[in-house]
């Protein structure tokens, strides 16, 4: 109906470049970096805000650029079903070439023994934290036998001395390496990897 196809690149809206629209409005979005601001901006369809029923867009398709008028819709009129066939219930699995994969959102601390037993002889393990993971990075590090290392530094208040603060090292791992995992550790992150995801990434890097 609107002559839009998967793979089309929308470069302008009402003759204004996408980058310019974002730069003008990003100051109104609360986020730590531009990547997250762009995600929020896109998710809420700010690029297509208008008081009219239609907008003009510039499309790049197959190395050609052309203008198109598209209709605007209410959200309730749109089919926003995600048709991807990704099994979001996967906790862990073995990939080709003897590589392990762990989804940190679908797995939890009760799965650590099972994960280690099945993936301990793999060449590498991919920990996917492009999500909001469950809190068991500590148990993963300990189970994989890594010796204790500093993962983060925290500033804490000295309650016996008002106004005084001190540094505290946050360490994860075992007192000594016990049959440590010998393969490579790969951590998958993206703009969704925030808060607990960031903390989990620091834990796994120890």
Regions found by a protein language model. Give the residues of each.
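Short, structured coil/loop segments at alpha-helix boundaries
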Residues: 1-3, 32-34, 99
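Cleft-lining beta-strand/loop regions that shape enzyme active-site pockets
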Residues: 49-54, 58-206
